[in-house]
Amino acid sequence: MQPPRERLVVTGRAGWMGMGRGAGRSALGFWPTLAFLLCSFPAATSPCKILKCNSEFWSATSGSHAPASDDTPEFCAALRSYALCTRRTARTCRGDLAYHSAVHGIEDLMSQHNCSKDGPTSQPRLRTLPPAGDSQERSDSPEICHYEKSFHKHSATPNYTHCGLFGDPHLRTFTDRFQTCKVQGAWPLIDNNYLNVQVTNTPVLPGSAATATSKLTIIFKNFQECVDQKVYQAEMDELPAAFVDGSKNGGDKHGANSLKITEKVSGQHVEIQAKYIGTTIVVRQVGRYLTFAVRMPEEVVNAVEDWDSQGLYLCLRGCPLNQQIDFQAFHTNAEGTGARRLAAASPAPTAPETFPYETAVAKCKEKLPVEDLYYQACVFDLLTTGDVNFTLAAYYALEDVKMLHSNKDKLHLYERTRDLPGRAAAGLPLAPRPLLGALVPLLALLPVFC
């Protein structure tokens, strides 16, 4: 009997070739092939995301989501989405057998179904209109405008991630890397197929390298029948509770209420719910400066057309190495030598002489009793800015993590991320979980095929 990998090579293309309409029993060859792809190449051991692509295509074309015999356009859309997914992960899949088998299979299926390479793609998991009375939005709002509803017929739930920016500024990425950055000027926090977030950081003190966020721009892109393009902009001393056009929702489309702005505290705290992409954004003004926090599904985080062009997507890849500050070393040296002696030799921003280290520690302990990275960031900010409002910035950043982070075991971080130059440049992408709902039907098949 052939080993599983050799059998996969033999059956890979043959299985795909049998998927044409009216292919009869030979069409069944596709499903064992896909089963092999899912069971033979564990996602956790490779940066290649082909299993995610396979699972999404399985989910879109099997069970209650399977296109009917006359739904060739829908099937072609699913294939184009599959092809797009493989292109996004191509850089990390060179030499991966499952990846190359999938690429060849997509070409075969598109040829058999006369699918054009150009055309619409299906959104993640083909969705249907919700039952009457089941929508939390307007009664005529389509289900595609409520991200979590698309999981009702699957056993899996979305895997959410968090990114936050606060203080001087400190960045917590979608992969829980924690960095302190200079990043003066305008920088992109998020740049994917659904929205863009850009921050502008300005010096806190004249001539100092210490910066903080003074402006934030969020662009929600036009999305099907859900929302029109909307722009939100906040600046120092101006935290509006509406988009720049004065509206508070997604416009005039059926699913407009799937995008909403809510003012929690006037001039201090705004929350934006984008239910059509399962995303929650929190913007605060603390003192003169802004903080940002977001909760977003991995699927949306990774919806990027060209990975190679995303080198400055800070929430995903972190700050460039030459923009990072080792604030833990600053904190350790300050504790041992005193902030005044450190100021002359430290590459970090100059510390105001009027703010003693002991006072910074005492003020941060009042709000942040756990000596984690948020506490250390607080001490760093007080030493480098002399502004006590940065204590609240760190406190609220941690409160936002508690509300938005899906893993309650990762609320507190204790070790700063020290990127190697190669890793910082490459910016390893987030590794999404396989779609469990698509894998469940395969569990019974694995003893047969693996």
Swiss-Prot record:
Keywords annotated in UniProt: Autocatalytic cleavage, Cell membrane, Disulfide bond, Glycoprotein, GPI-anchor, Lipoprotein, Membrane, Signal
Glycan attachment points: N114, N159, N389
Residues annotated as signal peptide: 1-47
InterPro entries (alphabetical): RGM, RGM_C, RGM_N
Functional summary from the UniProt entry: Member of the repulsive guidance molecule (RGM) family that performs several functions in the developing and adult nervous system. Regulates cephalic neural tube closure, inhibits neurite outgrowth and cortical neuron branching, and the formation of mature synapses. Binding to its receptor NEO1/neogenin induces activation of RHOA-ROCK1/Rho-kinase signaling pathway through UNC5B-ARHGEF12/LARG-PTK2/FAK1 cascade, leading to collapse of the neuronal growth cone and neurite outgrowth inhibition.
An annotated Gene Ontology molecular function: coreceptor activity
Any one GO CC term of the record: plasma membrane
Gene Ontology process terms (BP): BMP signaling pathway; membrane protein ectodomain proteolysis; negative regulation of axon regeneration; negative regulation of collateral sprouting; neural tube closure; neuron projection development; positive regulation of membrane protein ectodomain proteolysis; positive regulation of neuron projection development
Proregion positions: 48-168, 425-450
Post-translational note: Autocatalytically cleaved at low pH; the two chains remain linked via two disulfide bonds.
Principal place of residence: membrane
Origin: domain of life: Eukaryota
Lipid attachment points (GPI-anchor amidated alanine): A424
Record has Repeat as a keyword: no
Localization per Swiss-Prot or TrEMBL: Cell membrane
Cystine connections: C145-C226, C163-C315
Protein name: Repulsive guidance molecule A
